[in-house]
Amino acid sequence: MLPVNRARALLTILSQAKTLNHTQQVHAKVIIHGFEDEVVLGSSLTNAYIQSNRLDFATSSFNRIPCWKRNRHSWNTILSGYSKSKTCCYSDVLLLYNRMRRHCDGVDSFNLVFAIKACVGLGLLENGILIHGLAMKNGLDKDDYVAPSLVEMYAQLGTMESAQKVFDEIPVRNSVLWGVLMKGYLKYSKDPEVFRLFCLMRDTGLALDALTLICLVKACGNVFAGKVGKCVHGVSIRRSFIDQSDYLQASIIDMYVKCRLLDNARKLFETSVDRNVVMWTTLISGFAKCERAVEAFDLFRQMLRESILPNQCTLAAILVSCSSLGSLRHGKSVHGYMIRNGIEMDAVNFTSFIDMYARCGNIQMARTVFDMMPERNVISWSSMINAFGINGLFEEALDCFHKMKSQNVVPNSVTFVSLLSACSHSGNVKEGWKQFESMTRDYGVVPEEEHYACMVDLLGRAGEIGEAKSFIDNMPVKPMASAWGALLSACRIHKEVDLAGEIAEKLLSMEPEKSSVYVLLSNIYADAGMWEMVNCVRRKMGIKGYRKHVGQSATEVG
């Protein structure tokens, strides 16, 4: 057989190789017949080893091709292997790209994309700009593969203005390019820009793809646009994207959870075939945050029955449910599960256990967990201060605050929320004012919504309703719903019925979908024996489709 025919035969056999063993057998024949330095066979061997996830063999095969014989195809083959490999770092890709530039004339869209992605991974914007210039020089900056990579590079490393400029200069834009730009705006929390781009893309007549829908549904979750999110879900079903992308399914579930549409989230979750730990955790966390703790526990048990191992985030979420239920037994069972399965506790878990034990009334166990921590940061100290506070142990909370400072841990915004909450639970108005003034003067912590709400709660609990109302009216920022909510709760305690009606109106103008305001106002009128007003409020609830949920508790006594 002529050498050319023999080489072609080996290429055919190599293209049919299915396993690493088959590839090595063909490689042996290539060596025997002296074809190892041939660029076509060498490149094909390199690719075959890459497909078998043996980058070491691929590199060895590539290196046996003489430098003067290597062409763009052979360089792109090895570059693709390094780019896709989980064992190599971005610096290896960039080093290989620089070697190619020294030994091979010209560039193409493939090796430019590999180099740009490596620059993004390494955070090398200046190198990326040089590659952008090279792409422009070779007329490839508007290529269907290169352009999205450049937009992503500027979105990740530069500014969205730069990314938008590159995007605007591209005359023909495909759906990938639109999706990459939307993804960039999502990173910078510019959700309105995502909606704007979607409308512009739709007007061009381009078909939507999974990336576009994922960006759109994430933006819906960020701004709590549940109705729009439902429409996106509908589109993804009609165009069959929902069955093709697990990530899209997970994103829609996350959107429903953020919008508190938990029943919609669970319905989609139940139809998902590949339910991974992220999906389980998202749903469990959603039920826990919405105080539907029993359902969160049911999901957690179902997760374990299906042999899905929980991660640290799952366990932190289920501990929120333990706190919500006030169930020490459930909390201890989770603690025991972690110990039995050798799961190491991180700072988040330690803090979650402190909070859970404190809310279940076992302050001694909360303190034990705190003492077990190998390292204590400002979050763990703040959590312990809060633990003392919610159990009415103000002196211990204040002592913990002073100990934290003695350990050179600087209090932050969360610390003062915990401390002001402790003042509120103990009714210590004087100390509350002292700490509120100190936080800015001594520590540079600017009061936020939660700090103002704590002060309103403190004054309200102490019966200083007028001063609490005056405090809200004179706040340097626009009062948020949490501050008005704290005052409404105080109105119930101190039977300030007229003021309660006024505050409820303000709250409903800010959060018209919040049914808990109607429930609290109804209870205030009921406490005052104003049954006509109770019926009036409940009729409004009925018109809006709200109903009073029966509370669930597992608080243990004895």
Swiss-Prot record:
Its main location: mitochondrion. Keywords: Mitochondrion, Repeat, Transit peptide. GO terms for cellular component: mitochondrion. Pfam families: E_motif, PPR, PPR_2. InterPro entries: E_motif, Pentatricopeptide_rpt, PPR_At4g14850-like_plant, TPR-like_helical_dom_sf. Residues 483-558 are annotated as: Type E motif. One of its GO terms (molecular function) is RNA binding. PPR repeats lie at residues 38-68, 71-103, 108-142, 143-173, 174-208, 209-243, 245-275, 276-310, 311-345, 346-376, 377-411, 412-447, 448-482. Residues 1-79 form a transit peptide. It is found in: Mitochondrion. The keyword Mitochondrion applies. GO terms for biological process: mitochondrial mRNA modification. PANTHER family: PENTATRICOPEPTIDE REPEAT-CONTAINING PROTEIN (PTHR47926:SF347). Belongs to the PPR family. PCMP-E subfamily. NCBIfam families: PPR (TIGR00756). This is Pentatricopeptide repeat-containing protein At1g06140, mitochondrial. It comes from Arabidopsis thaliana. The gene is PCMP-E61.
